[in-house]
Design a protein with these regions (language model features):
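Phosphate- and other anionic-substrate recognition elements at nucleic-acid/protein interfaces
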Residues: 1-128
């Protein structure tokens, strides 16, 4: 009988120059940001307030983790509009990500970290 080993979670900093993508699940009062490497492995995630100070913290958070080349943002026409402007002003590339079907979200459960992760995956997959 063979046993399967799982890779440990990513705990070491990425090498300098590593490219990353991010996804943001937007809401009226908070935004949840997930950063992935180009293979889709989680690098970091965190929740921020949805205001000017929070936007600045998001930009700093993204820059602190490396070269974030694309950011998938849900709701750039509504709750994500201010954030999309702040990210674009900071020189970051923003891609509109469609919110997932409500019925599908209910089946798997609502999770801001998971929704942010899925937004980043959509950017990686080119489906955003």
């Amino acid at each position: 009988m063979t046993s399967m080993t799982l890779d440990p979670p990513l705990t070491n900093p990425l090498p300098p120059g590593s490219e990353l993508v991010a996804g943001v699940d937007t809401h009226k009062n908070t935004h949840h940001v997930a950063i992935l490497d180009l293979v889709g492995r989680p690098v970091a995630d965190r929740e921020f307030r949805a205001d000017g100070r929070g936007y600045a913290q998001i930009v700093a958070f993204l820059h602190a983790h490396g070269d974030v080349v694309r950011i998938g943002v849900e709701g750039t026409g509504s709750y994500g509009a201010g954030l999309a402007r702040a990210l674009t002003t900071a020189g970051l590339t923003v891609i509109e990500v469609a919110r997932q079907d409500r019925q599908a979200r209910r089946r798997r459960g609502k999770s801001d970290p998971l929704d942010a992760h899925q937004a980043a995956v959509a950017v990686l997959a080119g489906t955003a």
